[in-house]
């Protein structure tokens, strides 16, 4: 497997820390050791997150092509678009963001706080669109690129989650290689890796990266899309393409993609009571914040799987904290009583 042949533009601080979650582990019975790899602390660019790791492999292509405008898309509280806006500002590029109405959540300040607020502060051209949730290629995004061209600019397309870009999975192949190096220092290997999945390239990259040492099926995706069949298919497709790109040396199959579908509801962007309880529990046990859209759902999944005994006693489980906390302000009503 050869990741080094792909150019990478550094946007992160370096390897992200692995933090033992000792109090949470003890609270859940102490039979399973929980750890978190803090992708939410990976960069100084507007709070960073998992998309910043992915963008390190997309940006060299944008620069090589002489593009002057990054064009991306997401929901109103998209972490992706905030990270793209930050990277554009950092590189002195323009940025156009399409923010669609992916979440059925009504709050007077939902489109004015959190991620979208930061994108505006960062200087992005933010365009609200009424279209609902989907993880595929969107007409509104294609129109935004056409608008840039019509104005004489040269757009660089960054799809939702970076996932439909052919290089979108590379960052999290690198994540797996980084974990292996950290495991060598720690003196043990993680038995399971838990990660939130929606557009798919984060888990896809991990599946490929951990397939290199026989752990593809130990990457446990927690679906947050509430469209699990579409998400599973997209993870598999991206993983297969990424495996070919990096020369994994074996085919990725549907059995390599593990996606737990119990925690994505009631729908994308809306948390269940179990997710809200998981957010509070993690915060109060560890001082670590998660969000209602993504990381709260994967935290809910991990906690519930421990409670159900789905991780064997003695397991070491690595929770991938992908970011997302800037969206908390948009859900302040849900936490008005703590």
From Swiss-Prot:
Enzyme class name: hydrolase
The EC number(s) this enzyme carries: 3.5.99.7
InterPro entries found in the cross-reference section: ACCD_DCysDesulf, ACP_carboxylate_deaminase, ACP_carboxylate_deaminase_bac, TrpB-like_PALP, TrpB-like_PALP_sf
Pfam families per record: PALP
Active site: 78
Coiled-coil region list: none
UniProt xrefs under CDD domains: ACCD (cd06449)
An example Gene Ontology biological process: amine catabolic process
N6-(pyridoxal phosphate)lysine PTM positions: 51
Keywords noted in UniProt: Hydrolase, Pyridoxal phosphate
Stated role: Catalyzes a cyclopropane ring-opening reaction, the irreversible conversion of 1-aminocyclopropane-1-carboxylate (ACC) to ammonia and alpha-ketobutyrate. Allows growth on ACC as a nitrogen source.
Assigned protein family: Belongs to the ACC deaminase/D-cysteine desulfhydrase family.
Subunit structure comment from the entry: Homotrimer.
UniProt protein name: 1-aminocyclopropane-1-carboxylate deaminase
Lineage: Bacteria, Pseudomonadati, Pseudomonadota, Betaproteobacteria, Burkholderiales
């Amino acid at each position: 497997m050869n990741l080094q042949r792909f150019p990478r533009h550094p946007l992160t601080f370096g390897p992200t820390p692995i933090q033992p979650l000792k109090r949470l582990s003890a609270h859940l019975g102490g039979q399973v050791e929980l750890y978190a790899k803090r992708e939410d602390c990976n960069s100084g660019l507007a709070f960073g997150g998992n998309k910043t790791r992915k963008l390190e492999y997309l940006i060299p292509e944008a620069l090589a092509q002489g593009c002057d405008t990054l064009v991306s898309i997401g929901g109103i509280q998209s972490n992706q678009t905030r990270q793209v806006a930050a990277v554009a500002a950092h590189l002195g590029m323009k940025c156009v963001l399409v923010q669609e109405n992916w979440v059925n959540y009504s709050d007077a300040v939902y489109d004015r706080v959190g991620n979208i607020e930061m994108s505006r502060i960062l200087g992005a051209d933010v365009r609200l669109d009424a279209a609902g949730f989907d993880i595929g290629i969107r007409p509104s995004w294609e129109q935004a690129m056409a608008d840039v061209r019509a104005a004489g600019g040269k757009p660089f397309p960054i799809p939702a989650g970076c996932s439909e870009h052919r290089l979108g999975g590379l960052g999290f192949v690198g994540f797996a290689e980084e974990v292996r190096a950290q495991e060598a220092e720690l003196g043990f290997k993680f038995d399971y890796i838990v990660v939130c999945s929606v557009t798919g390239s984060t888990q896809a990259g991990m599946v490929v990266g951990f397939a290199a040492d026989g752990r593809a099926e130990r990457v446990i995706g927690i679906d947050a899309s509430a469209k699990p069949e579409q998400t599973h298919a997209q993870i598999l497709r991206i993983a297969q393409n990424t495996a070919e790109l990096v020369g994994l040396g074996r085919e990725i199959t549907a059995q390599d993609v593990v996606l737990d579908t119990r925690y994505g509801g009631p729908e994308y962007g809306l948390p269940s009571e179990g997710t809200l309880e998981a957010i509070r529990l993690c915060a109060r046990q560890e001082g670590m914040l998660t969000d209602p859209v993504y990381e709260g759902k994967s935290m809910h999944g991990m906690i519930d799987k421990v409670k159900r005994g789905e991780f064997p006693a003695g397991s070491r489980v690595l929770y991938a904290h992908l970011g997302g906390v800037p969206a908390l302000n948009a859900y302040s009503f849900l936490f008005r009583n703590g």
